[in-house]
Amino acid sequence: MDISKLMQQAKDMQGKMAAIQEDLAKKIITGSAGGGMVEVQVNGQGEILAIKIEDALINTDEKEMLQDLVTAATNDGLRRAKDLSKQEMGQLTGGMNLPDLTNFLS
């Protein structure tokens, strides 16, 4: 086994991962709740970019429901971003589930 070849492969994979992470940061995923009355936009790295709330929900009598919908939409968006990230990283790893790979190569 050639150590220098393995090191080069690891370096190449690290570069590819960095490119994927950069690409994920540019992708916008929308999570929604309440039939689209609340939408949360996140990027592929799980950062919240925007929250949109329909005017009909902005009523102090509905505060608790609004909070629940914002939470649900946020979780939906973050789940979708995580799924996208797994899909993109899966292309790099040939579909192998390597949960520690991101930490190792970053």
From Swiss-Prot:
It comes from the Bacteria. One of its GO terms (molecular function) is DNA binding. The keyword Isomerase does not apply. It holds the Pfam family YbaB_DNA_bd. Transmembrane segments: none annotated. One of its GO terms (cellular component) is bacterial nucleoid. Keywords: Cytoplasm, DNA-binding. Its main location: cytoplasm. The keyword Oxidoreductase does not apply. Binds to DNA and alters its conformation. May be involved in regulation of gene expression, nucleoid organization and DNA protection. HAMAP family: DNA_YbaB_EbfC. Homodimer. This is Nucleoid-associated protein DP1429.
